[in-house]
Amino acid sequence: MLYQQIARNKRKTALIMVLFVVILTLVGAGLGYLFSNSPWTGIIIALAGSLIYLLIMWQNPANMIMSLNHAQEIQEADNPELWHIVEDMAMVARVPMPRVFIIPDPSPNAFATGRDPEHSAVAVTQGILELMNREELEGVLGHELSHVRNYDILLSTIGVVLVGVISFISGIASRYIWFFGGNRRDDEDRDTNAFEIIFKVIAIVFVLILGPISASLAQMALSRNREYLADASSVELTRNPQGLISALRKIEGSQPMRQADRSSAGLYIENPFHNHGLSHLFDTHPPTEDRIKRLEHM
């Protein structure tokens, strides 16, 4: 089953990459139409910029994601207990020892990232170290190292990168429209017909709203089922479902994180922003109670 899941994750990576390229192309086309009346100019700029960003980040994606989340790398002497738990879980999972980071945030949480098991890293918050006992930490780190073993980190890293790119493009567009849109409209009103106005409105809506939402939904599609599998794999490693159950309950009852990066939310073991209501539709994690019920039946 493990090798089948790894193969599925690699196929999903290719499919999600295609989906993100489509979204990027549409966002770029809208951007080009708004700024120069040339969709192709925007497409070329968006795709070329994204490719350069991906190539730069791909050299060491863990470093950039850790930086976005204000995580600080540690060595064994800095926190021997945490180091040895990670070391033990890595040995049981049969993956290389990942780099270890601590996030200076009082809310308990953790995540893993990297492009493959040989270039992986795990991060835990200061809050999780203060709040949880060894059994709970083993459950959490077993979950994160299961993501490493199953190549989930590759999918998640790609999702973070591409959502970040699309959000960056949308941010540039919104600032440009805010500062310069009024002047352009005054100059162009005489020469603009009704169809051009409609197309510009559609382009604005897609670049500023639909593009980022579509990217977030694509990222969400990467995450939900993988959390259930990582929970089950953690129990396989620790032989103790109660440790992870207790950890999930403590995380669910905690305050939202202050140091987490929003584009990285899907990486964490539990949503660091604790979305509720309508925003739960866009959550990258299954409901905690559903996860706990599955663990209780193992």
Swiss-Prot record:
Catalytic residue list: 144
Spans through the membrane: 15-35, 38-58, 153-173, 197-217
InterPro entries registered for this protein in UniProt: HtpX_protease (IPR050083), Pept_M48_protease_HtpX (IPR022919), Peptidase_M48 (IPR001915)
Bound cofactor: record note: Binds 1 zinc ion per subunit.
Listed CDD domains: M48B_Htpx_like
Protein's UniProt keywords contain Cell membrane: yes
GO BP: any one term: proteolysis
Compartments, record wording: Cell membrane
The UniProt record lists the keyword DNA repair: no
Annotated disulfide bonds: none
Annotated Zn(2+) binding sites: 143, 147, 227
PANTHER family: PROTEASE HTPX
Similarity remark: Belongs to the peptidase M48B family.
Record's protein name: Protease HtpX homolog
Organism of origin: Lactobacillus acidophilus (strain ATCC 700396 / NCK56 / N2 / NCFM)
